[in-house]
From Swiss-Prot:
Family designation: Belongs to the RNA polymerase subunit epsilon family.
Gene Ontology biological process terms in this record: DNA-templated transcription
Function: A non-essential component of RNA polymerase (RNAP).
Pfam families assigned: RpoY (PF07288)
Enzyme Commission number(s) of this protein: 2.7.7.6
Annotated keywords: DNA-directed RNA polymerase, Nucleotidyltransferase, Transcription, Transferase
GO molecular function: DNA binding; DNA-directed RNA polymerase activity
Species, as recorded: Staphylococcus haemolyticus (strain JCSC1435)
Catalytic activity line of the entry: RNA(n) + a ribonucleoside 5'-triphosphate = RNA(n+1) + diphosphate
UniProt protein name: DNA-directed RNA polymerase subunit epsilon
Source organism, top-level taxon: Bacteria
Length: 72
């Protein structure tokens, strides 16, 4: 399992504006699994990145909302 950081807008109809970008963390096997997990939400997904090593540790320590959802 890996942790993915998902950058998104709350509404698929919104134009992507960096200042309105939200993030969530999702644990899954692949990016495709994470996308399937989120498909029923009305999110306009900008980008998904896999977090590993020092990057993952940094997010755990410095994110105010590091709560991981499970895509299983």
């Amino acid at each position: 399992m890996a942790v993915f950081k998902v950058f998104f807008q709350h509404n698929k109809d919104e134009v992507i504006v960096r200042e309105n970008t939200n993030t969530i963390y999702v644990e899954g096997e692949t990016e495709e699994q994470v996308r399937r997990y989120l498909k029923d939400r009305n999110y306009n997904i900008e980008f998904i990145t896999k977090l590993e090593g020092a990057h993952l540790e940094y997010e755990k320590e410095h994110s105010d909302h590091f709560n991981v959802e499970n895509a299983q």
